[in-house]
Amino acid sequence: MEKLLDILEKENSHIRCYRTKKYSIDENTSDIIEYDDINRKPSELKKTSFAETEQTNAPTVNISNHLITTTQGKPLFTYFLDGSRHCYMIDDILIGDKIYPLGGGEIIVGCCSRKDGKFKSEKIFQQIVISAPKNIDDKEDGEPYLRSLLDKFNYSIQKGPKALQTLGISIDKVLKYAIDGGQSNLDKKEFKSRLVAKIQNEMTDHEQIMVRELCNEGKLDDDNWLIKDGSIEYNQNFSNIENNIKSIVEKTNYKHVVGISKSFNPDLIKDYKGKKLSKTIAELKPFERTKVYRYEYQTGRGDSSYFGIWYLRLRKNSFRETNFSDIVKCEVLLDGETGKIDTEQVDLLSANIINEAYPTCYGNDTRWANHLYPVYLTEKFCKSRYRDSNIILNLF
């Protein structure tokens, strides 16, 4: 079978492949994002206003045992969505007088549903991509050139070993990362970050597309909410989708969606007194939440989206590893700058989120204290779909 690098050199006289070591970038901890909201800009406001209807100046709210118990019979959350990606370093390639990293990735976005006590897969999106420097296309032919390359790659795969054909593997897309941006001294490390970012952007684009599909199919309503694993604060500067079709982030799609982050920056916003909220978060008692605070997020389209953010402690655990163990960050999209979420709705959502934390995945995931069990199952479902890394790397 003719490998991708061989085809790339054959089709591009201006490219030289060095055939350096191939490896999984994800195995390098320096490439792993520590917080779900690591790229979120801390609020510059001296104080942050409440984004719930109850405006009492109390720092925390207790979720009553009665509410937690009464919501167990009919869960509010029906759908659970997670995105995952593996990134690979394929080679160092010479274009002109500069060396660039060439990467690949496998992207999986999955949604599971729970209906009548049965948990099953609802939707799955999966693709293999190449992440290459923008000048891989020396003639700037754009999509026709990239499609021609993909056709040649995939034809070679189809003519390869039968075992590979049985898996139905194909390379679906070539992503092109920026190589300039007004900086002439960019190094390999920066290019590598851009390579990974392009794959990450593709994954988050398809998370949003899947949310849109659920809305268009009429599956999300007042009685059937979606938990999205991670933040729902999407910046359109970090998207691979053309500007004229970025309607995937229509705000109406998120009316019945809650973003739940297991890891977060506790200093993202200040409280109503202008003090760091991290102290209040760390001191939350079992089944207690912070007030809902308004957070303005620049969308990258010249406007802002406004989110209601609160933090919730999920468990009665006297032996937690850190003060932030078993606390999750919860996000909902607000209706404009002055929008608020009804306090009773926040408490109802919080009670349901607490119930989703049981049973636990203790012993199976080091993040068990901050995990919601249906989200854990959805994550496991997505990751079970990954092809073996050696198979992916051997394509190239």
Q: Where on the chain are the PLM-derived regions?
A:
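Long, contiguous domain-sized segments
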Residues: 1-49, 53-54, 59-72, 90-93, ...
